[in-house]
Amino acid sequence: MDKLTEVLNLAKSKGYFWPSYEIYGGVSGFYTIGPMGSLVLKNIEDLWKSYFVRPNGFLEIDSPDIMPARVLKASGHVDNFKDPMAECAKCGSKYRADHLLSDSGIQVSESTSINQMNELLNQNKVKCPNCGATTWTVKQFLNMFETNIGPYADNKGYLRPETAQGIFVEFKTLLDINRGKVPMGIAQIGRGYRNEISPRQSMIRLREFHMMELELFMDPEDEKAPALDRDMKLPLLHEKVMEKGEPELISPYGAYKNGILKSAWLAYFLEKSFKFVMALGVPESKQRFIEKLVGERAHYSAQTFDHEVFFDEMGWTEVAGFAYRTDYDLKSHAKETGQELVVIEKKTISTRKTIKLNEKEVKNTHKKDWESIISSVPESREDGIYCAGIKLSSNEYKIIEEVEKEEVRKFVPYVVEPSFGLDRLLLATIYYAYGKKDGRNILSLPDVILGKVVAVLPLVSKKDMIEKAFEIKAMLEKSGYFVIFDEKGYIGKRYARLDEAGIPKAITVDGQTLEDGTVTIRDRDTWNQKRIRPSDLLV
């Protein structure tokens, strides 16, 4: 049994995730996230926000899952969000044409045309996995779930294929909320839907999935991106080294300055993503960024890099994509709606300064000369302000600066988008946490993912021990811990169950606990134990 199969079996048995609708035979492309999976998913989301949202003061929204057809027609998805579908002439089974070819050892790219795939399938007599026939018809298949909004058949809608369009259509309101300033980052975490022809590879290709996306709106003439790291090295398999097949190790700063990356924000997000995925437990050597070439990238993108993680069984697998969407989306929605989706920037060209006297102070200070001072024109000299030849103190006047001339500039901001597949990240996190010790399964999840999870175990099922264990459980929960309570079975078997589930710490309540209040705390990875007071965990 390979590692991925073991991980998938463990994920189901320990409540992380499993195929949905199994009592009905299952439906490919749908997975249920279990109790432990939901907990880890939320912690991955929070970690992502700590890398991508909070440090820059970005905003977060939650838009509807259903979109009017008009929105997705304007965005280009209705015309372009399609995959090549091959239909068997004998049995009618349908598959992704490019997947059929690659499974037969015939490599194609995303730029390979429908006609070319049709020829390759038929000329190479690729067999139908269902009936063995070798005659195919290939056509485009729209990857969006269609629905009606309300009772009218002509009011068509789609389940969103990405959360991004829910951000773009709200740009005008969000810009006002952000007081007209760019750069402006808008994040959204939610579900996406893609009516995949033939979903496979467990959590990798789903029909309903979780996404974490961020749209960064910026001035293309002045990006104002954060400082880029000059020391860390990113493995970039970019266009210039694609033929060699080996990534170039280069800093985010160097990649931008050398023109490999078209945007400083794009470089910044790749840097953040590399560190974020490392924090999930994926080693540097098992990560890379690969550039999508012309004909491969999405219709809205001027440059795209995929962040890939290596699985022994599946090879390099995308977990995130970074698209330089420029002004494509905002211009498309502006054209369709007639709305002006722009940033208005006012720049002062010149100002005029005027000196206004505080007549009350002048009268109080200059009882003899105040009339001549007030009737004269203030004069600015190197050492101060004078009126009628008399130098005034600072409380006798104020200088008012007024805009004399300003320049108004309107521009459609450019967009850089980091987009993460949350389900894929969950799988990668568990995959790289999975290991064995003395023949036992251990899920060594990082502390940033399960650090605030602990098990409380009464050594034996005695009333006083159980009561004390519940008391400790309540104290820990009050302090923000997620607590698992388990009193069934031998203590060694309970430890093994917890190790396999990834629970980092286990507290055992025993006879000594009833005497002095101390408990045994056991570490999942080292199996070391020591006695502490439960309150020590709150420090």
Segments the model singles out, each with a brief description of its role:
Residues 1-539:
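NTP/phosphate- and nucleic-acid-binding module
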